[in-house]
């Protein structure tokens, strides 16, 4: 049996990486001050409307209204410059992760994958267990479709010994459940990363939307075909063969509408297929009878708004759509950064000690030391 996880930026964030567009954009704006006019214009546009650009790819479609057929390739130059800096930023963030504690990392992800459905509501858990019961006499492959450009997910999965999730005995036959394939549907930092829109309709400039030579640079499905890496087709096949699909760390944004539409068609294709959506929400309260139903309604409505499949109503699939508000894969791996900060701080203290009188003591702590004398230095630690 095939179980597939669709993984978004929430995974990298759960490891401690600062990988949201909104966290990168201020740096790009700052760097843009010394660039050519065309590139500087883009950084200034971001600065003026930073709230609108919180969902970057969607805003690209709106931004096309600032261009005409005469300067349309200025937009491509701007996006290329942005992508180059963003990828460098992601690589910098990824380099901060610490993977030395292989055993603990491997054990955490092995156990989390094995128990992925245990944060669901009781009846949902029963439904998922029934699927596993039906396909108990087969090995279970846990596949991953990553929408991230980093390889943080790959590195975590590599820590699982022999990629083995579980071993089961059924009627005297041993079955092994393993980590299957990882497909990066939008490429990697060093392998054709794709930033863009879902379709031509999302290009708000009608003149440019009717220009095929321009459009091919902005539409992700077209970009995937042109690069011939097979990422989209491999991901599509992975979905088709799955019995359970989980969405984790994704906002279900409209620039990936192609995939949400496909999931609706897939779910409708068999009564033994189940979709699980992990929507992290620490502030959700169970003290109201309305909150959970509203969340489910919102999810159903969003999927229906993306649904282009004739004759299919997402509401009719509700019983096989499950929701969890737990952040199951969160596992901070920024120890390297913390150690670097400590080493840097200690180095600064040493330099400070060299500059002051040798009789001067430097104290570090939450409270001022009682034995400090006049002229001593107290560095207060604030948590």
Regions found by a protein language model. Give the residues of each.
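C-terminal regions of proteins
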Residues: 258-266, 273-348
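Short, surface-exposed amphipathic charged segments that create phosphate/polyanion-binding patches used
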Residues: 183, 194-205, 331-344
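Short, conserved active-site loop motifs that form the nucleotide-linked donor/cofactor pocket
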Residues: 142, 180-182, 312-314, 318-321, ...
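Phosphate-binding glycine-rich loops of NTP-binding sites
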Residues: 9-11
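Active-site periphery "cap/insert" segments of enzyme catalytic domains
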Residues: 2-6, 15, 19, 23-187, ...
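Acidic, metal/cofactor-coordinating or nucleic-acid-engaging core segments within structured domains
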Residues: 40, 193-240, 289-300
């Amino acid at each position: 049996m095939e179980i597939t996880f669709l993984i978004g930026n929430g995974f990298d964030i759960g490891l401690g990486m600062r990988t949201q567009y909104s966290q990168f954009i201020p740096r790009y704006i700052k760097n843009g001050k010394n660039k050519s006019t065309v590139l500087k214009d883009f950084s200034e546009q971001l600065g003026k409307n930073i709230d609108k650009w919180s969902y970057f790819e969607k805003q690209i479609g709106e931004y096309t209204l600032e261009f005409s057929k005469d300067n349309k390739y200025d937009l491509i130059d701007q996006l290329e410059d942005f992508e180059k800096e963003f990828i460098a930023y992601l690589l910098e963030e990824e380099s901060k992760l610490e993977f030395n504690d292989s055993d603990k990392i491997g054990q955490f992800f092995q156990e989390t994958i094995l128990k992925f459905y245990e944060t669901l509501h009781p009846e949902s858990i029963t439904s998922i267990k029934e699927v596993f019961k039906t396909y108990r006499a087969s090995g279970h492959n846990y596949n991953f479709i990553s929408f991230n450009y980093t390889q943080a997910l790959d590195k975590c999965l590599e820590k699982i010994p022999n990629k083995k999730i579980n071993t089961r005995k059924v009627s005297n036959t041993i079955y092994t459940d393993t980590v299957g394939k990882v497909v990066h549907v939008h490429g990697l930092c060093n392998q054709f990363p794709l930033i863009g829109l879902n379709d031509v309709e999302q290009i708000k400039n009608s003149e440019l939307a009717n220009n095929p030579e321009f459009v091919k640079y902005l539409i992700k499905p077209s970009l995937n075909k042109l690069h011939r890496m097979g990422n989209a087709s491999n991901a599509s096949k992975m979905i088709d063969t799955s019995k359970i699909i989980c969405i984790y760390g994704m906002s279900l944004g409209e620039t990936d509408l192609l995939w949400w539409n496909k999931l609706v068609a897939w779910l409708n294709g068999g009564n033994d297929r189940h979709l699980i959506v992990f929507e992290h929400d620490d502030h959700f309260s169970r003290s109201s009878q309305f909150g959970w139903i509203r969340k489910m309604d919102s999810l159903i409505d969003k999927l229906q708004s993306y649904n282009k499949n004739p004759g299919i109503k997402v509401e009719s699939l509700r019983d096989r759509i499950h929701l969890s508000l737990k952040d199951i894969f969160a596992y901070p791996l920024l120890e390297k950064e913390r150690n670097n900060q400590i080493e840097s701080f200690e180095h600064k203290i040493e330099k400070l000690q060299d500059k002051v009188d040798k009789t001067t003591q430097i104290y570090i702590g939450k409270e001022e030391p009682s034995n400090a004398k006049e002229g001593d230095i107290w560095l207060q630690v604030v948590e």
